C-alpha cells in the first residue's frame, strides 16, 4: 500500500543535493493526511527519506524544469516532475542531529514531513532552549533555538528596513530575559544592547536598565570616561591630525600624569613598570591642555629666556591659558619661547573647543568619572562596570541616539574595549565571562563595522567573534546592509536570522556566510512576510522558515513607520517651531521649553 506521504523517489545524488522524481500518483498540489492539508512541493518545506532505523531530512530547494538532473534533460522522459532537495540532518528515533552519516540510494522513497514529524524534531523543551516563534508552515509548532550556541557561536539578525528586525531582536531578548512578569527561565542572563536609534527602551522597559545621554524618567545618565578608551583614537578626535613627533611627546606627558597619580593613589593590579598611555587610569584633559598650550604661547622678558613675560595666570579648570605679553617681530623683548614647542596651537584650539562642546559632555566630562586636575576621580571602572553589567535587570541598554555621529565609531569601540578586556582578564572570577557569559547586541552594525573601516569598533568586534567564545562573550550583529559589514565578522557568526532582504548583494553576502548551503531558502528572502525569518546555523536544529513571536503592541520597539495618511488627515494645529529648534540645540528629543503646555517634561 502506498503511503499517503509519498512524494517521489530519488533519481540522482550529488553531494548534499538530491534530485527527486515526483510520484506520478500526485494529481493535486494538496495532500490530506490525518485530517490536515499539506501543500506539496513547496520551496523551503521539509522532506523525509527513510533509511531503515533512521531518517534523513532535507529541504526542497527547487521545483520544476530547473530541478531536472543534467543527465536527464535531453532524455525522453522530460514530462517527469522533479524536485531538488538539499540534505540537512538525520534522526534516530526522536533524537535529531545536524549532518548525515550516510547518503540515500537511487529509488529510495521521499516523503512529505507532517506536523507530527516536525513536532518530534522541534518538540524538545530541554534546558538551554528558547522559543523564538512558530513554524511558518505549521503554526501549531513552536520553534526553539539553542541558547548556548546562539550566544557563544555568535549570531546575526539581518533584514531590509521594515522587515521586522527590531521586533525580532526584542522578541529574542524577551524570550531569554523574561517579560518582567513571570519568573524568567534564565534569571542570571546578562545582555548589553547598543541601541543606536533609541528604539528599545519602551519595548524592554520591564527587563532592562537604560542609560542615555539625556535620560528620561526611569533612565540613568550615560557616562563613558574618555580615559578608559583608546588614547590614540581620543587624540585624533580631540586634535585632528598631529605629526608623530608631537604625538610621542603628548603620550609621554600622559604617562607622566598617570605615574604621578599612582604615587598618591593605589589601583589594584597596576604595575608602574608596565604603565602605558593606554593603561585604563584617569588623567585630566584640562591639565593636559594647559600644559601643552603654555609652551606654544609663552614669551620672555630676557634673551636668556628665564623670566616669563606673564601678564595673568591662567586656570586649567576653566580652560584659561596663561596670558603673556605678545612677542615682538624685532630682536627685542618680549622673546618667543623655543623650548618644548610642538607647533600644535591650532590642534590645541580644536581640543579646547571639543572640551567646551556640551554635546560631548557624556564622554569628556563623565560625571563621577571625570578626573580632577591631579587625576583623582570620585568613581573608578569597577563602579562603571557594576552599573553596566551588574544591574538587577538582565538587560542593559546603552542608548546612543544622542551621541554625535563624529564620535560614534570611536565610542562604540571604547565601550566594547572596556567590557571585553574586563571580562576576559577576569574570566575566572564570579563576574567574569566564563562564570556569567555576556551577549552583546549591536544594532545598525553596518554603520561602524564596515569593510573599509579602520576603527577600534571593528577591531574589537573582530576580537569578540574570533576569541569571545572561549571567554564567555557572544555577539549578535543586527543590520539591514550585510553587504557592507566586514567579511571576517559576518563569517564568524554561527547562526543567522534572515528576514526579508530585497537587495541582491545583501542576499549574496548572507548565502556566502551561511553554514548551510541552502540556495532555495535564500532565494525566498525577498518574499518573506514582515516578521517572518529563515533561521539557520548552529543554534537551529534545522534551517527553518519561522514566524517570529510578536511582543504586545505596547512592548514593541519605537521603529514603526508613521501613518502618513492618518497624520495628514488631521486638522491643522498651530505651529511652534521653537520646540524642535530647542530640542535640536539641546540634542535631546524629549526637551521642551519652560512653560510649554504640550505635556512633556521640561529639559
Residue ranges and their predicted role:
Residues 194, 442, 478-479:
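Hydrophobic residues in beta-strands of the RecA-like P-loop NTPase core, especially within AAA+ ATPase
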Residues 212-216, 223-228, 496-505:
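Conserved AAA+ ATPase "SRH/arginine-finger" region at the nucleotide-binding site
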Residues 303, 310-313, 317-321, 327, ...:
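Conserved P-loop NTPase motor module
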Residues 240, 457, 463-547:
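Conserved ATP-driven motor cores of ASCE-family P-loop NTPases powering translocation/secretion/packaging/pilus
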Residues 1-159, 167-168, 172, 178-182, ...:
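Basic- and hydrophobic-enriched, low-structure N-terminal and domain-boundary segments
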Residues 129-214, 487, 535, 565-567, ...:
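Glycine-rich phosphate-binding loop of nucleotide-binding enzymes
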Amino acid at each position: 500500500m502506498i503511503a499517503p506521504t509519498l512524494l517521489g523517489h530519488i533519481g540522482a545524488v550529488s553531494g548534499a543535493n538530491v534530485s527527486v522524481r515526483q510520484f506520478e500518483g500526485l494529481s493535486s498540489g494538496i495532500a490530506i493526511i490525518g485530517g490536515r492539508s499539506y501543500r506539496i512541493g513547496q520551496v523551503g518545506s521539509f522532506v523525509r527519506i527513510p533509511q531503515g532505523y533512521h531518517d534523513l531530512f532535507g529541504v526542497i530547494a527547487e521545483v520544476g524544469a530547473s530541478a531536472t538532473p543534467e543527465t536527464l534533460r535531453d532524455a525522453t522522459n522530460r514530462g517527469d516532475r522533479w524536485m531538488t532537495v538539499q540534505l540537512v540532518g538525520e534522526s534516530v528515533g526522536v533524537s535529531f542531529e545536524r549532518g548525515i552519516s550516510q547518503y540515500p540510494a537511487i529509488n529510495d522513497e521521499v516523503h512529505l514531513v507532517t506536523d507530527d514529524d516536525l513536532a518530534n524534531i522541534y518538540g524538545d523543551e530541554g534546558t538551554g532552549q528558547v522559543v523564538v516563534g512558530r513554524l511558518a508552515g505549521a503554526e501549531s509548532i513552536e520553534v526553539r533555538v539553542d541558547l548556548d550556541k546562539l550566544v557563544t557561536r555568535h549570531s546575526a539578525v539581518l533584514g531590509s528596513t521594515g522587515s521586522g528586525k527590531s521586533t525580532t531582536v526584542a522578541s529574542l531578548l524577551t524570550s531569554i530575559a523574561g517579560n518582567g512578569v513571570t519568573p524568567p527561565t534564565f534569571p542570571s542572563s546578562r545582555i548589553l544592547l547598543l541601541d543606536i536609534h533609541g528604539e528599545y527602551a519602551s519595548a524592554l522597559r520591564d527587563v532592562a536598565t537604560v542609560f542615555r545621554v539625556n535620560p528620561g524618567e526611569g533612565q540613568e545618565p550615560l557616562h563613558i570616561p574618555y580615559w578608559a578608551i583608546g588614547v590614540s583614537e581620543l587624540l585624533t578626535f580631540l586634535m585632528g591630525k598631529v605629526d608623530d613627533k608631537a604625538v610621542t611627546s603628548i603620550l609621554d606627558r600622559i604617562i607622566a600624569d598617570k605615574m604621578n597619580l599612582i604615587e598618591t593613589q593605589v589601583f589594584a593590579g597596576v604595575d608602574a613598570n608596565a604603565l602605558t598611555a593606554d593603561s585604563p587610569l584617569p588623567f585630566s584633559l584640562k591639565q593636559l591642555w594647559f600644559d601643552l598650550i603654555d609652551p606654544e604661547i609663552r614669551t620672555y622678558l630676557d634673551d636668556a629666556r628665564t623670566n616669563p613675560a606673564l601678564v595673568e595666570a591662567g586656570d586649567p579648570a576653566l580652560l584659561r591659558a596663561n596670558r603673556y605679553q605678545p612677542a615682538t617681530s624685532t630682536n627685542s623683548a618680549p622673546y618667543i619661547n623655543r623650548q618644548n614647542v610642538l607647533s600644535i596651537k591650532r590642534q590645541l584650539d580644536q581640543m579646547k573647543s571639543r572640551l567646551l562642546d556640551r554635546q560631548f559632555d557624556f564622554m569628556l566630562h563623565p560625571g563621577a568619572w571625570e578626573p580632577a586636575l591631579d587625576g583623582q576621580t570620585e568613581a573608578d571602572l569597577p563602579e562603571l562596570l557594576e552599573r553596566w553589567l551588574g544591574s538587577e535587570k538582565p538587560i542593559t541598554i546603552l542608548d546612543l541616539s544622542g551621541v554625535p555621529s563624529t564620535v560614534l565609531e570611536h565610542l562604540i569601540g571604547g565601550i566594547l574595549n572596556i567590557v571585553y578586556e574586563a571580562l576576559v582578564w577576569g574570566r575566572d572570577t564570579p563576574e567574569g565571562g566564563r562564570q556569567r557569559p555576556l551577549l552583546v547586541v549591536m544594532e545598525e552594525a553596518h554603520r561602524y563595522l564596515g569593510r573599509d573601516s579602520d576603527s577600534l569598533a571593528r577591531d574589537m568586534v573582530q576580537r569578540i567573534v574570533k576569541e569571545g567564545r572561549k571567554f564567555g562573550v557572544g555577539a549578535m550583529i543586527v543590520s539591514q546592509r550585510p553587504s557592507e559589514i566586514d567579511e571576517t565578522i559576518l563569517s564568524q557568526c554561527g547562526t543567522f536570522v534572515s528576514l526579508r532582504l530585497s537587495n541582491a548583494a545583501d542576499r549574496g553576502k548572507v548565502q556566502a556566510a551561511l553554514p548551510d548551503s541552502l540556495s532555495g531558502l535564500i532565494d525566498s528572502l525577498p518574499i518573506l512576510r514582515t516578521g517572518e525569518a529563515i533561521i539557520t546555523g548552529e543554534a537551529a536544529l534545522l534551517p527553518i522558515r519561522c514566524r517570529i513571536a510578536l511582543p504586545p503592541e505596547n512592548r514593541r520597539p519605537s521603529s514603526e513607520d508613521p501613518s502618513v495618511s492618518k497624520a495628514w488627515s488631521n486638522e491643522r494645529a498651530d505651529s511652534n517651531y521653537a520646540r524642535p529648534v530647542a530640542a535640536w540645540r539641546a540634542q535631546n528629543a524629549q526637551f521642551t521649553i519652560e512653560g510649554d503646555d504640550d505635556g512633556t517634561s521640561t529639559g
